[in-house]
């Protein structure tokens, strides 16, 4: 019966030697209402007076009590020094380190002092546990937890929600699936009102780990007994119901020993419950608890075995990553260089062994930069951004020189469209920079995840990082130059014969023709009414005549781009069509710039430029022709409006063609001059820079803590293998 628990304690000690708390040993948690006899039951199991006793609330902090069985011959225990203590039983607290207590009165006093230190001296309760280990030849190997008793009404310094606090504290301990619940209920209370059984069923509804203990059998009313309760006829408990007799307060005051109490308990049971005496009492409770603990440990063994195997595999892998001491430095260096270069290229290709799941990295991020970041940035560039009407008119006038232009010069279109195309260079260079940064990040990714062997040799790691960084740094200006040339190529020749550009011009011609027809249909009625009222040809009407409503609305508008209306023919004074006919438009963009004489006359009639000079020169300052002219806001003429509109449409059409070319060619250039070049030359560059006999000893110098890490991993692996062997022995020898 006692053979299994020492093995589990030994297993726990194996992990404690390496500073790990891996296995949760099954605990026996004692719960019950206040003054139900929980501490008395624990004292009976220990066999000594070591817990504070009294009326009211006494246990105000959880007490984790570990009972350790020792042989009667093993009396001398040392504290790690030459001097030790000579005792048959002793105790040790966690908070007092290696101090040993041979007087159990001192243990009880230390529990009271430690309780008051945290919880105060006025019935306060604290969830912080007290750890006590008791060594004795009179106990079996058990771990018990004594909890504060459940109460309803706060007293002393207890908060108003003391009932809820204690309930949460109890649930925290009994919710552990590896615990056995000892539900203590007094025999002089109704079993149906047991708070201990009620809270136990909340976490253990099947009753698979709940054992009921009935205390105070000797305090029942005269003429009554607990026969029905002990036999499970009132409330059945799956693991059983055990009755015990505790010492009374008078017995404690009279210094009655636990041994005498157990002897008197046996006599009482033989007298009152002779048929149940062999299945009740403190000794039977201890044996039952030990048996339940054994079965519970047996059920936990498969999980413990699995956890140990997983940890052993992890530490074995860690030890392998640390590697063995280097024998052939030349081969080791070449192997590490080759492995790093392979992992670097695999990370770009997406075939690396260690793939990130939390974020994009490597080739996936480069793809995201090309098609998401760079693509969206180019699409956000406005083809007409930074251009206004004044800029366009100024470019047109500067391109014509001193001569008035009959058509819009092509030079102005090229000048303006080149200005817009140049705006694509900055996001293209930024794309190169982002790809360069990602390739820098791949270095760190490979160092951390893919080639952990490099962590053994920090100097080699730093040298590899430096070589790859220099290689990337050398390729950066080459790639930037190529991207700059791609933009320069587009600027070098404006291809107005581009198929997409010709199609766009033809479509715009059709749109303008449609706009002319629509405007003519709207203006003919207004022109006819004006002829009847003024009797003057509309083309020669005085400038002072008010324009029709449509023209007035036009006059109020600002200098913005819109679809300017043009007439197809000008009506004569008699209502007929004038001599000015429409010239046919051509298929290229020059056809958009032609106009008819009637259109010019109508434009002059509709809007006269606002005079810039003062009406009375005598009253103003003298005009100096050498002064720089100041731009004056005025309404554009119909021709100026049309010229601006045509130029804007042409710029937008050609800009979209160039943007499409840049969006396609820049990623290709980056891949060829930066990414693929680095992939192809990385290994040869690393070998050429680092694979030298003069650098072997320096590069393959291990870090100072690597040997310590290797030793710790080996010790942990050895401890895990020992634990696995112990579990195998338990399974083969004791359980199956």
UniProtKB/Swiss-Prot annotation:
Residues 22-302 form the Dynamin-type G domain. It is found in: Cytoplasm, Cytosol; Golgi apparatus; Endomembrane system; Mitochondrion outer membrane. It is an enzyme of class 3 (hydrolase). GO terms for cellular component: brush border; clathrin-coated pit; cytoplasm; cytosol; endoplasmic reticulum; Golgi membrane; late endosome; lysosome. The modification S-nitrosocysteine is found at residue 644. InterPro entries: Dynamin, Dynamin_GTPase, Dynamin_GTPase_CS, Dynamin_N, Dynamin_stalk, G_DYNAMIN_dom, GED, GED_dom. Residues 542-736 are annotated as: C-terminal dimerization domain. Residues 654-668 are annotated as: Important for homodimerization. Residues 522-554, 566-588 are annotated as: Disordered. The gene is Dnm1l. Residues 58-60 are annotated as: G2 motif. This is Dynamin-1-like protein. CDD domains: DLP_1 (cd08771). Disruption phenotype: Mutant mice show severe developmental abnormalities and die between 10.5 and 12.5 dpc. Compared to wild-type littermates, mutant embryos at 9.5-11.5 dpc have a significantly smaller body size, pulsing, but less developed cardiac structures, a poorly developed liver and a thinner neural tube cell layer. They lack trophoblastic giant cell layer in the placenta. Primary cultures of mutant neuronal cells have severe defects in synapse formation and high sensitivity to Ca(2+)-dependent apoptosis. Within cerebellar neurons, Purkinje cells are particularly sensitive to Dnm1l ablation. It catalyses: GTP + H2O = GDP + phosphate + H(+). It is a peripheral membrane protein. GTP binds at residues 32-40, 215-221, 246-249. Residues 32-39 are annotated as: G1 motif.
